[in-house]
């Protein structure tokens, strides 16, 4: 019973990974649209896109860490 609850909790924690993937796609989609509209700002916009990617990926890594903690520690 407890093992099943752990697996369900870990599975629920990994749902955030799908949200992070969608967020990263939105970041780079917005980058492509912005550079297409104003190519002279490409370098500055790329820096902002990398920052957005890093923050979104950090959330995904925290969710993955929680899933591993639920699976293997508790």
UniProtKB/Swiss-Prot annotation:
Top-rank taxon: Eukaryota
Parts of the chain that traverse the membrane: 8-28, 50-70
Subunit structure: F-type ATPases have 2 components, CF(1) - the catalytic core - and CF(0) - the membrane proton channel. CF(1) has five subunits: alpha(3), beta(3), gamma(1), delta(1), epsilon(1). CF(0) has three main subunits: a, b and c.
Name used for this protein in its record: ATP synthase subunit 9, mitochondrial
GO cellular component: mitochondrial membrane; proton-transporting ATP synthase complex; proton-transporting two-sector ATPase complex, proton-transporting domain
GO molecular function, one term: ATP binding
Residues of the site described as Reversibly protonated during proton transport: 57
UniProt keyword annotations, A-Z: ATP-binding, CF(0), Hydrogen ion transport, Ion transport, Lipid-binding, Membrane, Mitochondrion, Nucleotide-binding, Transmembrane, Transmembrane helix, Transport
Cell compartment(s), UniProt: Mitochondrion membrane
Coarse class of the protein's main subcellular location: mitochondrion
Coiled-coil ranges (or none): none
Biological processes annotated in GO: proton motive force-driven ATP synthesis
Function per UniProt: This protein is one of the chains of the nonenzymatic membrane component (F0) of mitochondrial ATPase.
Family designation: Belongs to the ATPase C chain family.
Entry-linked InterPro entries: ATP_synth_F0_csu (IPR000454), ATP_synth_F0_csu_DDCD_BS (IPR020537), ATP_synth_F0_csu_sf (IPR038662), ATPase_proteolipid_c-like_dom (IPR002379), F/V-ATP_Csub_sf (IPR035921)
Topological category with respect to the lipid bilayer: Multi-pass membrane protein
